[in-house]
Design a protein with these regions (language model features):
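Extended, low-complexity intrinsically disordered regions enriched in serine/proline/glycine/threonine
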Residues: 28-362
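Transmembrane alpha-helices of multi-pass eukaryotic membrane proteins
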Residues: 13, 543-559, 612-626
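Proline-anchored loop/turn motifs at beta-strand termini and strand-loop-strand connectors
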Residues: 399-417, 424-426
């Protein structure tokens, strides 16, 4: 056989190189970025916001449905259920809007209600949306190891028109306020990352440090278009309490110092480098506007009040929608750090400093009124934060819009005509405050009630209260959840302010600078906030009654039949013979001892034994048990 020609050998050798080139080109179309934002909070806590983005282009004939970085499960989810947008959040704790802020991009987009919240927009005909929603909940339940499948019931989800997000009727929204959040939900969430938690910024997610925080919310958001492909945004927001036992608490001036902290101090983990497949890996330390005003330094990372443990690679100024500097971002690029040069950025406080975060226009609260298990009232209160005074050109005749979305289970029967509005202590007609309202009444055991309202408050208003009366329905015993005596949780109400947005601008940022986190901050997100979960007590049956009846009945029957069968099967003559033998046997030993000693013993005394009335006792016992059984039967029937 002749050896292959040089041209053929070169073609054979170039084939693997060509395959590697095609694979690298396909992988280069998919992108992954990882970012972390750290921020000190006024109440001596620290905020950590992890953000990961995975993007894939639309499938082509060459690439098909194969992925190299993007998670395949998410791609199949989008294609199977025709999803245009989807957002799923798992939250433990409640965001403190008064202290941690309510009008900045981070709180407006990442502060979520307790439990599970899911909404999705489908690219399907209206007739197929509900069935697709039910299948989607089961798929997400298995994917994230949670009870999301409870949202498949028509009594657990709704289709809001404009109170949540403007849509054409293809949006579905549901919430499970009682759903617990644990590591079983975080593990599948991390598996969607190309490096998981083995490398990069995700390696800081140490479970004991994450779940001991005051607030924990993990979110997954999908956006799918025909031209842009699929974009998967994963974010994790945690509020942690730095350990103050090792830090100095009091300053020589008498003030209380903020606790100093670092990444290793917060997460008990070292950051050794970036994820190898990530396009960019950055860490930002945000210094808020309140700190900048008090410290008198705009961009300095070292001043008389605080100092960052590591000099930043870049400093960015943020401008809010009023073109006013709101904060500064100190950037650290992880490509400049490795195992030999690890990064442990933190903040060291030198002087006491008190500041406040930017609040929402109103702090919204919701609570119950009334007493008893038959009826009550739900009150939604608004307390002004005087944010309107900071707006240019505000006058006494101006107004602030507020959109309210509330979901009510079918067993909370709302009387929508009973709406009362009280502003600054005086009652107002609904027509004076309501610009628009949409009500979807609930149907018993079929669908929940939905209330959407567009309110217009005067800028000079300090407080307002909306009151709705309701009746409490009755449930079948099979419809009660575990621990029903605690009460029933009503999902949080959503309050948004269309006149206020939380967008930020970065005029000094390079156009080639790629940061999905800052791109989200640039979007015109409406300022919104969630109220508390409402706990409504309902009349519950005595679930222990069947157990008590069964236990008592079985005990009585066991005593009755046991004694009756014992009396019927036992012979009285055998009992007397057994007693006589028991009395004779102990007397043999004294008789033998007496004969050995030479004493005379009367045999009649040793053989005589007292006759016990055994038969009479048994008859009395059987009669008593029979009387008890008859009395119990009579009382149970009556």
């Amino acid at each position: 056989m002749s050896p292959p020609s040089p041209a053929r050998r070169s073609s054979v050798l170039s084939l693997p190189l060509l395959l590697l080139t095609l694979t690298a080109a396909a992988a280069s179309e998919e992108e992954f970025t990882e970012e972390l934002l750290l921020r000190p909070l006024p109440d001596r806590k620290a905020l950590s916001h992890f953000h990961f983005r995975s993007a894939t282009p639309p499938p082509t004939a060459a690439s098909g449905l194969h992925h190299h970085i993007f998670p395949k499960a998410i791609s199949q989810l989008v294609q199977r259920f025709h999803i245009s947008e989807l957002e799923l959040s798992f939250t433990q704790g409640r965001w403190n809007y008064e202290t941690w802020g309510g009008s900045d991009p981070l709180s407006a987009d990442n502060a979520k209600p307790p439990g599970v919240e899911l909404w999705a927009v489908f690219d399907l005909p209206f007739a197929d949306i509900d069935a697709t929603w039910k299948n989607l909940t089961h798929t997400l339940s298995g994917l994230f190891c949670a009870s999301i499948n409870f949202l498949e019931s028509s009594t657990a989800f709704s289709a809001p028109r404009w109170g949540f997000k403007s849509n054409e009727g293809n949006l579905r929204y549901g919430a499970l306020p009682r759903e617990a959040v644990c590591t079983e939900n975080l593990t599948p969430w991390l598996k969607l990352l190309p490096c998981r938690d083995k490398a990069g910024i995700a390696s800081l997610l140490y479970r004991p440090s994450i779940y001991k925080g005051y607030y924990h919310s993990q979110k997954l958001k999908l956006t799918s278009t025909q031209t842009g492909g699929i974009i998967l945004d994963q974010s994790l927001t945690v509020v942690l309490q730095p350990n103050t036992s090792k830090s100095k608490q009091l300053h020589s001036t008498g003030g209380k110092l903020q606790p100093s902290w670092s990444m290793e101090h917060l997460f008990n983990r070292n950051l050794l480098g970036k994820c190898l497949v990530s396009r960019s890996s950055r860490i930002f330390v945000e210094i808020e506007k309140g700190i900048l005003l008090k410290s008198g330094s705009e961009v300095s990372w070292r001043n008389k009040f605080f100092e960052l443990s590591t000099a930043p690679d870049r400093v960015l100024k943020e401008l809010d929608h009023l073109e006013v500097q709101s904060s500064s971002l100190h950037e650290y690029d992880l490509s400049n750090y490795n195992d030999d040069k690890p990064l442990d950025v933190g903040i060291i406080w030198k002087l006491p400093l008190i500041w406040s975060c930017s609040p929402a226009p109103y702090n919204a609260r919701r609570f119950l009124m009334g007493s008893g298990n038959e009826r009550g009232s739900i009150a939604l209160s608004f307390l002004s934060t005087d944010l309107n005074k900071q707006l240019p050109g505000s006058s006494n005749d101006c107004s602030i819009k507020a959109v309210v979305l509330q979901l009510f289970p079918w067993y909370v029967k709302i009387f929508y005509h009973s709406l009362q509005i009280v502003i600054d202590g005086s009652s107002k007609a609904a027509s004076e405050v309501l610009d628009m309202i949409h009500v979807t009444p609930s149907e018993d055991k079929l669908s929940p009630g939905t209330l959407e309202m567009l309110l217009r408050f005067p800028c000079s208003m300090q407080s307002a209260t909306l009151i709705l009366d309701f009746d409490k329905g009755f449930l079948h015993i099979d419809e009660y959840p575990p621990d029903a005596n605690q009460g029933f949780d009503i999902p949080s109400a959503l309050v948004s302010f269309p006149d206020f947005n939380s967008s930020r601008k970065y005029p000094e940022m390079d156009p080639m600078f790629v940061s999905p986190l800052l791109e989200n901050f640039k979007e015109d997100n409406v300022v919104k906030s969630y109220t508390e979960v409402l706990l409504v007590p309902l009349t519950t049956p005595d679930f222990s009654m069947p157990y008590n009846v069964i236990t008592f009945t079985c005990t009585v029957l066991a005593l009755y039949f046991g004694s009756l069968l014992n009396a019927l099967r036992r012979r009285i003559g055998e009992e007397e013979c057994r007693l006589r033998k028991a009395a004779v046997k102990p007397a043999l030993i004294p008789l033998l001892l007496a004969r050995l000693r030479g004493h005379k013993v009367d045999p009649s005394e040793s053989e005589s034994s007292p006759a016990s009335p055994v038969g009479l006792k048994l008859l009395v016992k059987v009669a008593l048990v029979a009387i008890v059984a008859v009395v119990f039967h009579y009382l149970s029937n009556s």
